[in-house]
UniProtKB/Swiss-Prot annotation:
An annotated Gene Ontology molecular function: DNA binding
Native source organism of the sequence: Rickettsia prowazekii (strain Madrid E)
Protein name as it appears in the record: Cold shock-like protein CspA
SS bond partners: none
GO cellular component: cytosol
Alphabetical list of Gene3D superfamilies matching this protein: Nucleic acid-binding proteins
Residues in CSD domain copies: 7-67
Amino acid sequence: MATNIVGKVKWYNSTKNFGFIEQDNGGKDVFVHKSAIDAAGLHSLEEGQEVIFDIEEKQGKAYAVNLRVK
């Protein structure tokens, strides 16, 4: 698991409860689900919002977890 990755919210759809975070290090965009947002105590994410997160691999896909606002 990669930790303390810095990035910006590329987009988040609050109706569909998911979005993507663009990594500042140029890595692939990372999927973020509402469950990670809820676990962080946040209500939603805004496009361009700076965040710090960990990446967890599940079934070959990367997910943002342990989300924090920068």
